[in-house]
């Protein structure tokens, strides 16, 4: 995951009414379209006056001014939908008087810990906010061999013992946080804030010689399991996927619990390997997706089953994550024939699994969870962390091909990781595909549209890859792996693949094709949506899918040729 994580930020419990400030306006009078909305965060409701005509960007700027949350770190959710278009206004999204909006914040995922003893010994290490107390114990002992064994440590907060699964992000919330580390030889840890970090001072008597320490084995929970979900026994599972699943399973058996990430609007867990020194995968349970029954981030249940993005359903994100990996064919051909090769866009290996562990969010009792497991990618951050000018053109193009094909409704810089290959070249890795393959094009969003690389022509190699794509083969391949796509979703894949191939035939760039798919504003339909409506009007009711696609092909040819003439 990137170095930036998404979390529901802790706030003061008292409400704060954010004033509506306009030039030449009186403090006791407001424009006619003024409304009162309520921003909710854990433990807090914040009344806020806005105008129905205010843009989403301007509302976020006011939140930044009064609460200090940077605009790019904010997500607003209303009525089960993310207010993702910055230039759209509150009225466009149907926000009116008295409505409740959920504010999700992205914070730094790294916490610097300074550990000191009264005898002058000191060490410093970085801890991800998604790490737990058990990990902190191991790091303290590992950094300083004369510290107490992790098994001999107990950490209390406000008089209550913290379990090893407790997250740093959930504990270090208040400026006056004090942690007491109780060891068999009675040690204490006091935490005080130092700017954005925490400083830990440890008081402990001289530790015993390592040889004199009592060896303790880690005893994992009695009930735990991690197995692949196999729908078709004939479907070949790539070796890299088998190894990932085995490593995650061995990690659980070794007592290395899942570590919940503070990133994202749904539940996501870092799965550790048997050594406990590195992550091997990221598990996203279906029942913890945004607006699902057991979502741990405080989002409400979906009122109609629709996901945060139009054309998606709650609980189908894991299927789409796996589908993106399966359909990311390598340059040499269909992934069903060459399962061991890396896909053209580089989607990390992903599989559907079932896992039982008490470390997940189980408000109604511990049960087996089904979800997607994606290989963890070591990275240097995400594309949000730096400007796009340094991104290689081919790296941006490969992601654009994937997003256009799958009609991705949630491509932003935060879900494109940056890493380097063996030669030191920058490589972009696309992740988070739970909102691809929607049933409509309404929410298609491609951040790379605004990057200069998108205006460059596709290389001959990329064009050849695009020509090799076949939507019907893709639909059959997903069915072979266990997902019989809904008719609307299959139609989206056929249309987006058709547009991509026709666009490349005419020499269109990623920017030009992507612009056809994405709406300029929330209320103005995209050109591809208009093409679909035109084709639907040209055929009789009850017409076959093949006849509709033939009509759409003619409509698409006309619009693409006409646009080139101008």
From Swiss-Prot:
Location of region: Activation loop: 430-456
Recorded GO MF terms: 1-phosphatidylinositol 4-kinase activity; ATP binding; protein serine/threonine kinase activity
InterPro entries: Kinase-like_dom_sf (IPR011009), P4KG1-8 (IPR044571), PI3/4_kinase_cat_dom (IPR000403), Ubiquitin-like_dom (IPR000626), Ubiquitin-like_domsf (IPR029071), Ubiquitin_dom (IPR019956)
Key words of the record: ATP-binding, Kinase, Membrane, Nucleotide-binding, Phosphoprotein, Repeat, Transferase
Domain Ubiquitin-like span(s) in chain numbering: 34-111, 112-190
Catalytic activity: a 1,2-diacyl-sn-glycero-3-phospho-(1D-myo-inositol) + ATP = a 1,2-diacyl-sn-glycero-3-phospho-(1D-myo-inositol 4-phosphate) + ADP + H(+)
Matches recorded under Pfam families: PI3_PI4_kinase, ubiquitin
Subunit structure: Interacts with RPN10, UFD1 and CDC48 in vitro.
PANTHER family for this protein: PHOSPHATIDYLINOSITOL 4-KINASE GAMMA, PHOSPHATIDYLINOSITOL 4-KINASE GAMMA 4
Annotated protein name in UniProt: Phosphatidylinositol 4-kinase gamma 4
Source species of the chain: Arabidopsis thaliana
């Amino acid at each position: 995951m990137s170095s930036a994580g998404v979390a529901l930020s802790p706030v003061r419990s008292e409400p704060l009414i954010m004033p509506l400030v306009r030039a030449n306006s009186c403090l006791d009078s407001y424009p006619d379209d003024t409304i009162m909305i309520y921003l909710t965060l854990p433990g807090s409701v914040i009344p806020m006056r806005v105008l129905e005509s205010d843009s989403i960007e301007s509302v976020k700027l006011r939140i930044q001014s009064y609460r200090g949350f940077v605009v790019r770190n904010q997500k607003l959710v209303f009525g089960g939908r993310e207010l993702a278009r910055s230039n759209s206004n509150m009225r466009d999204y149907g926000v009116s008087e008295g409505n409740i909006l959920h504010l999700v914040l992205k914070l730094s995922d790294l916490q610097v810990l300074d550990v000191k003893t009264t005898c002058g010994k000191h060490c410093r290490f970085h801890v991800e906010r998604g790490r737990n107390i058990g990990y902190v114990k191991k790091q303290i002992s590992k950094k300083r061999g004369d510290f107490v064994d992790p098994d001999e440590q107990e950490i209390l907060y406000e008089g209550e013992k913290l379990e090893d699964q407790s997250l740093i992000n959930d504990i270090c919330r208040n400026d006056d946080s004090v942690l007491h580390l109780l060891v068999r030889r009675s040690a204490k840890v006091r935490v005080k804030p130092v700017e954005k970090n925490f400083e830990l001072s440890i008081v402990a008597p001289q530790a015993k010689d390592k040889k004199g320490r009592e060896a303790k084995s880690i005893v994992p929970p009695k009930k735990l399991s991690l197995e692949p979900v196999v729908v078709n026994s004939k479907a070949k599972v790539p070796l890299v996927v088998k190894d990932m699943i085995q490593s995650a399973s061995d990690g659980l058996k070794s007592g290395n619990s899942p570590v919940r990430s503070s990133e994202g609007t749904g539940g996501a867990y870092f799965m550790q390997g048997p050594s406990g020194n590195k992550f091997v995968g990221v598990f996203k349970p279906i029942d913890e997706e945004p607006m699902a029954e057991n979502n741990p981030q405080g989002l409400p249940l979906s009122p109609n089953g629709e996901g945060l993005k139009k054309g998606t359903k709650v609980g189908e994100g894991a299927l789409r994550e796996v589908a993106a990996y399966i359909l990311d064919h390598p340059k040499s051909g269909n992934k069903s024939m060459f399962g061991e090769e890396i896909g053209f866009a580089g989607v990390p290996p992903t599989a559907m699994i079932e896992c039982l562990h008490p470390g997940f969010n189980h408000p109604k009792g511990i049960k087996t969870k089904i979800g997607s497991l994606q290989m963890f990618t070591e990275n240097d951050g995400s594309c949000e962390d730096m400007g796009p000018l340094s991104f290689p053109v081919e790296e941006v193009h490969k992601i654009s091909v994937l997003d256009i094909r799958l009609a991705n409704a949630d491509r932003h810089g935060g879900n494109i990781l940056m890493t380097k290959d063996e030669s030191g070249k920058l490589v972009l890795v696309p992740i988070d595909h739970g909102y691809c393959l929607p049933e409509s094009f309404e929410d298609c969003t491609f951040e790379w549209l605004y990057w200069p690389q998108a205006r460059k022509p596709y290389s001959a190699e990329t064009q050849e890859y695009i020509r090799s794509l076949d939507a019907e083969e893709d639909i059959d391949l997903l069915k072979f792996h266990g997902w019989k796509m809904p008719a609307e979703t299959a139609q989206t894949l056929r249309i987006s693949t058709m547009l991509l191939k026709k666009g490349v035939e005419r020499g269109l760039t990623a920017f030009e094709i992507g612009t056809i798919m994405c709406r300029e504003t929330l209320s103005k339909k995209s050109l591809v949506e208009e093409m679909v409506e035109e084709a639907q009007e040209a055929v009789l009711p009850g017409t076959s899918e093949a006849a509709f696609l033939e009509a759409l092909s003619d409509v698409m040819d006309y619009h693409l040729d006409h646009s080139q003439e101008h």
